Amino acid sequence: MKAVERIFWSIALPGFGQLLNKQYVKGLTFIFLEFVVNTCANFNEAIMLSFLGETHQALTSIDYGWLMFYPCLYFFAMWDAFKEAGGGKAPYSFLPFAFCAYCVTVGLMVAPKAIFFGITFGPVFFPMICVIPGILLGLLIRKILLTFGNEDAVA
């Protein structure tokens, strides 16, 4: 339960899970990095515009060069908080987190071109949708590795 709580606090803000785990330097570092990347990417404005339905304006308001750092920072902070709180003991349990980071990063890159049924989901909602294939791919690859891989695998 403690590990799941840390994930949810890390979803709220990268670094909060580490603070709850009493890893203050690491937590404050994640918060600082989140603030820098968020500010330099102009991400809060893109979030606001996306929720207001101004998806095309959100697409042009962000700095993709900075925002592409965000998914890896975000999902690594979640994994770290989860692991340090006692989760992630099973072999390859990091894979869903890692594949979420990969899929969300790719989703961010293709967001300007991702149009379904005339709807542009933009730089906020399309990458969020990409979490689903990230989790599924991570779980699938974990299952394959556990089934056919080395029995001495470690997390």
Predicted regions and their residues:
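Transmembrane helix recognition focused on a "late"/terminal membrane span
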Residues: M1-R6, E34-A155
